Regions:
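Short glycine-/aliphatic-rich beta-strand segments at the starts of folded cytosolic domains
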Residues: 1-9
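Short connector loops at helix/strand junctions that flank enzyme active sites
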Residues: 2, 30-32, 57
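Charged interaction segments
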Residues: 19, 23, 39-76
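Hydrophobic residues in beta-strands and at strand termini
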Residues: 9, 37-39
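Short, flexible N-terminal segments of the mature chain
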Residues: 15-36
Length: 76
C-alpha cells in the first residue's frame, strides 16, 4: 500500500530515527516534511513502527491510498 507520511517534529526533538525509518522503507521525498512510502504493513503495524521513532508531542500523520485509489488519513 502506498502511504504518505507528513510530520512536524517539535523543536529540540531528534529527527534521525524518523529519517532512518523512512530510509528503511525507501521513502521518496515529496516536500520538506512529506515522504511517500510503499510497503505491505497494515496501517496499525505501520503506525506502531512510527511511534517507536518519535516522541509523543511530535505531530505525524499518515495518508494511505488503498487499491481502489481511495484516500484516508490518521494521526499517529
Amino acid at each position: 500500500m502506498k502511504r504518505l507520511i507528513t510530520y512536524d517534529i517539535i523543536k529540540g526533538n531528534d529527527y534521525s530515527k524518523l529519517y532512518e525509518f523512512i530510509e528503511k522503507y525507501k521513502g521518496i521525498q515529496i516536500t520538506e516534511s512529506t515522504y511517500e512510502i510503499t510497503c505491505s504493513l497494515s496501517l496499525d503495524v505501520f503506525k506502531q513502527e512510527i511511534r517507536k521513532v518519535i516522541r509523543s508531542n511530535d505531530k505525524v500523520y499518515v495518508i494511505s491510498v488503498n487499491k481502489d485509489k481511495a484516500l484516508f488519513y490518521t494521526k499517529v
